[in-house]
């Protein structure tokens, strides 16, 4: 019989570093560990509040003078593909979906390296070796799949890969990459379109895309999807006109970290034997 009390999640803050999306900005993240029997429950709850998973950590931006990064998701039931989306789907009809367990392969890593070297050679992941890649894929305490996309007309060659979490209300695209020589096929957009179809098949209402950043050319394509919602001031709302979003934020408009943590709604992590006191932990990270 368990007599110890479950420990409430502890939240930490990363040290500021250069923003990968907007020049001249500094990013900072609020994060907590994702572990134990209740990891899936916590992941489901915090994903609805704008958090993202990276291995066994959940995080969301908590920058001191910027709030440009907005968590984005698509309402599957309301999604109607635009003409350009239909063209992209037809352009990739030769691909087939191949879901796998979260287990890294040498073939996936080879494609990952080619993708980084071609498109993100100066990015934060550029130096990842095969062991770090395996950790990114395999270190998951929640329900995760690797969705491969293979070319049936070319010996089933690997064309794209998406690391996908299965939430209680949707699919979350954790990270995706594709063959750079197929860039003209808009594979990044195609992977999202296929995940919308996959969510429809599974009866899941949302597809989580990660962060949309107004003013960032890297993230602009996400705003092209109909039925897109963004997480703003604690609530999900229809994106409306992307041009209405301002990347400039007054420094005093950002809540202190302790207040941000206090506003997080934690799930009931009590098991059959034990109770949670509901307290939130907070510590400054290194």
Swiss-Prot record:
Its EC number is 2.3.2.29. It is found in: Cytoplasm. GO terms for cellular component: cytoplasm. Its main location: cytoplasm. Transmembrane segments: none annotated. Pfam families: ATE_C, ATE_N. InterPro entries: Acyl_CoA_acyltransferase, Asp_Glu_LeuTrfase, N-end_Aminoacyl_Trfase, N-end_Aminoacyl_Trfase_C, N-end_Aminoacyl_Trfase_N. Functions in the N-end rule pathway of protein degradation where it conjugates Leu from its aminoacyl-tRNA to the N-termini of proteins containing an N-terminal aspartate or glutamate. Belongs to the R-transferase family. Bpt subfamily. This is Aspartate/glutamate leucyltransferase.
């Amino acid at each position: 019989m368990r007599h110890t009390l479950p420990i409430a999640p502890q939240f930490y803050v990363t040290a500021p570093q250069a923003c990968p999306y907007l020049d001249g900005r500094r990013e900072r993240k609020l994060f907590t560990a994702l572990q134990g029997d209740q990891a899936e429950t916590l992941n489901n709850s915090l994903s609805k509040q704008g958090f993202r998973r990276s291995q066994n950590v959940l995080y969301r931006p908590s920058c001191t003078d910027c709030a440009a990064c907005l968590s984005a998701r698509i309402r599957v039931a309301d999604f109607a593909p635009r003409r350009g989306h239909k063209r992209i789907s037809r352009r990739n009809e030769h691909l087939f979906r191949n879901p796998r367990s979260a287990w890294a392969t040498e073939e996936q890593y080879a494609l990952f390296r080619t993708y980084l070297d071609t498109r993100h050679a100066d990015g934060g992941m550029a130096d990842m070796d095969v062991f770090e890649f395996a950790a990114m894929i395999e270190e998951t305490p929640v329900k995760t799949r690797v969705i491969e996309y293979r070319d049936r007309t070319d010996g089933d060659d690997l064309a794209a890969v998406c690391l996908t979490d299965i939430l209680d209300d949707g699919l979350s695209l954790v990270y995706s990459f594709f063959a750079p020589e197929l860039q003209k096929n808009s594979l990044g957009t195609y992977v999202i379109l296929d995940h919308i179809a996959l969510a429809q098949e599974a009866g899941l209402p949302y597809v989580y895309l990660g962060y949309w950043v107004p003013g960032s050319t890297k993230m602009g394509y996400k705003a092209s999807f109909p039925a897109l919602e963004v997480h703003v001031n604690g609530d999900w709302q229809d994106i409306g006109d992307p041009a209405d979003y301002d990347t400039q934020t007054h420094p005093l408009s950002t809540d202190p970290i302790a207040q941000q943590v206090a506003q997080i709604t934690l799930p009931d992590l009590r098991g059959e034997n034990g109770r949670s006191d509901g307290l939130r932990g907070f510590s400054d990270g290194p």
